[in-house]
Amino acid sequence: MSYIPFPDISPELFSIELFGVTFALRWYALAYIAGLLIGWRLVLRMIRAERLWSFGPPMTEDQLERLLTWVILGVILGGRLGFVLFYQPAHYLAHPLDILKVWEGGMSFHGGFLGVMTALVAFCLKERISILPVADLLAAATPPGLFLGRIANFINAELWGRPTTLPWGVAFPGEAAQSCPGIEGICARHPSQIYEAGLEGILLFAVLSLLVWRRGWLHWPGSVSGMFLAGYGATRFLVEFVRQPDAQFVSAGNPLGLAWQISGYGLTMGQILSLPMILLGLYLILRSRRTA
């Protein structure tokens, strides 16, 4: 069976030791930082492009600077709490201090999304500015960060896919990745992180950029946010078919790791969380067109 060996890339860019304590900069942390900075620059560019707006941009550059702090808190707190509540509530209920161990991994996109939305609504109410136009700005600027995050997932050899015999399957390192019932020897898996990087990162960014800069969708508040939600939800729903489910959902009687099922058919947790995003996204698109 042909497969692609996992590249020899350290998850750490570099590490230094100060006063007996080792500090390391990981690719994952760099992806978060770079994603936020790129997103900020993209939003700033859209704010400055007056032709994109019917009645001017929804906020000033100074307000954008303040919003960035709120977004950072929403991403970190929401992403962590989402993982705790959606994927391993029993573990963290028994070991509450483990919630603080973010360096051990465990972030949820859906939780981060809810955290950012909560921060966005609170910020807009405080600043007395319209919510949907600001949400459109953030939606159009989010995919580059998603792309970088998925590449970091690949480098960390985490969130890999289900076993496959396809020639582009990757032999991820580690006992968990190589534990494939019924497969002898090297176990190759779908590089689902790369699939997601291409779909929710590159493809979604291309679509949203076209709608913003060529089709003028920022003139219809909520339309860009709706396309982001529907696009991300749909791509995540599809990738879940080849993505390895979280270990806590997998058992001898549930080898596919379905979080909800009837007669052997069902949905993974990622698919369950993505369906409301798709429905809300379609609603926002239709609403924006009816009120245009």
Curated annotation (Swiss-Prot):
Protein residues bound to a 1,2-diacyl-sn-glycero-3-phospho-(1'-sn-glycerol): R150
Record localization: Cell inner membrane
Enzyme class label: transferase
Transmembrane segments: 18-38, 67-87, 105-125, 193-213, 222-242, 266-286
HAMAP family: Lgt
Recorded family membership: Belongs to the Lgt family.
Protein name: Phosphatidylglycerol--prolipoprotein diacylglyceryl transferase
Organism: Cereibacter sphaeroides (strain ATCC 17029 / ATH 2.4.9) (Rhodobacter sphaeroides)
Upper lineage: Bacteria, Pseudomonadati, Pseudomonadota, Alphaproteobacteria, Rhodobacterales
